[in-house]
């Protein structure tokens, strides 16, 4: 890719965060490595991050707009700022007329899987997303699950959708087996117990209730280690770790990573865990399982609790045999998770 090509990126907040904010930073770093300095249009811009030096910026001034309404005005403001700019747009937020609209989740899919009835704000979000999909030249779906929802819930033509799974930070998440004994000792993880790591910033959506029901009543030598939000109550066989910044270390120290999400448009947690050499025990509705093979771990159905018990029992058996760690993570995945590959795919559909 020639370094003089230009790209615009739209995002509400250009700052460290989760979801699309994190993905936008990935795009910026990846494009920079290709010699491309994109222009970011955002309402909030963090000038202290290294990525700021890799972009040009345009501030979308929303100070006079009520906070809840700001996302609905962003697209109109963006259009005015980009008048007469013959430069392709990658929308990482709900913006219209994108050359690539990045879909990392759908609101209708979220409401359906969470069993929620849409309120007025939800209906406005759904309406806004319909115009995003309608006016975009292409929609990048971060999973086949998203492709399915775009087609079946929103009526987006299949020929308009490209499935490109999101990248993982392979420079940060990797195996380091020599560290594991010391890290486990520091956390108090016992060698005769199988530790299942549950990273969660939303216990209901991530399926804590289903997992706790099993862990609290089992006689197996297992512990559920919860990283993230505090527990709603004390639980038998459950350890509360709190928020932890060094997630690669935590993934490596655990025997397995476990999750039973009600709705997971992709789930980079699974990819990150595998890259660190730790197999997963995941519900099969999580979209990241699309890119995993049988070497990645064990999978179960949320609709059948017996399959959860079977998966955990198999995991414990593998740990007791000393065969639970993955030595070649890439062989457990069916896609290339590197940022370089993701940027190549993105540029291929953009130009």
Place the predicted regions along the sequence by residue.
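Carbohydrate-associated surface elements
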Residues: 145, 167
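Conserved acidic donor-binding segment of nucleotide-sugar-dependent glycosyltransferases
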Residues: 294, 298-305, 314-320
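Aromatic "clamp/platform" in nucleotide-sugar-dependent glycosyltransferases that forms part
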Residues: 262
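A charged, aromatic-enriched C-terminal amphipathic alpha-helix characteristic of glycosyltransferases
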Residues: 303, 320-350
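Short alpha-helical donor nucleotide-sugar binding micro-motif in glycosyltransferases
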Residues: 243, 250-254
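Acidic anion/phosphate-binding donor-loop and adjacent secondary structure
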Residues: 151, 168-185, 192
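Short hydrophobic beta-strand element within catalytic cores of glycosyltransferases
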Residues: 279-282
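Conserved donor-binding/catalytic core segment of Leloir-type glycosyltransferases
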Residues: 190-206, 212-215
């Amino acid at each position: 890719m020639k370094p003089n090509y230009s790209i615009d990126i739209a995002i509400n907040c250009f700052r460290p965060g989760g979801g699309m904010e994190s993905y936008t930073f990935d795009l910026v770093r990846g494009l920079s490595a290709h010699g491309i300095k994109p222009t970011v249009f955002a309402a909030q811009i963090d000038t202290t991050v290294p990525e700021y030096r890799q972009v040009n910026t345009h501030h979308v001034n929303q100070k006079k707009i009520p906070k809840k309404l700001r996302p609905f005005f962003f697209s109109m403001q963006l259009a005015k700022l980009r008048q007469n700019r013959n430069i392709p747009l990658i929308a990482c937020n709900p913006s219209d007329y994108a050359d690539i609209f990045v879909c990392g989740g759908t609101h209708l899919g979220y409401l359906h899987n969470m069993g929620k009835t849409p309120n007025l704000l939800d209906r406005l979000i759904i309406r806004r997303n319909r115009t995003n999909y309608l006016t975009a030249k292409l929609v990048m779906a971060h999973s086949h699950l998203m492709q399915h929802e775009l087609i079946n819930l929103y009526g987006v033509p299949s020929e308009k959708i490209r499935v490109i799974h999101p990248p993982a930070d392979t420079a940060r998440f990797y195996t380091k087996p020599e560290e594991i004994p010391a890290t486990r000792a520091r956390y108090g993880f016992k060698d005769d117990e199988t530790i299942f790591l549950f990273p969660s910033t939303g216990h209901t959506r991530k399926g804590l209730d289903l997992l706790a029901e099993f862990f609290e009543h089992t006689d197996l030598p297992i512990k559920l280690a919860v990283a993230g939000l505090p527990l709603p109550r004390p639980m038998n066989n459950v350890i509360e770790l709190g928020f932890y910044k060094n997630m690669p270390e935590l993934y490596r120290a655990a025997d397995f990573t476990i999750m039973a999400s009600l709705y997971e448009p992709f789930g980079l947690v699974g990819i990150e865990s595998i890259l660190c050499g730790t197999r997963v025990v995941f519900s099969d509705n999580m979209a990241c399982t699309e890119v995993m093979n049988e070497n990645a771990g064990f999978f179960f159905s949320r609709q059948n609790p017996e399959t959860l018990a079977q998966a955990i029992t198999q995991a414990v058996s593998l740990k007791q045999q000393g065969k639970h760690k993955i030595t070649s993570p890439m062989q457990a995945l069916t896609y290339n998770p590197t940022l370089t590959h993701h940027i190549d795919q993105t540029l291929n559909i953009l130009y």
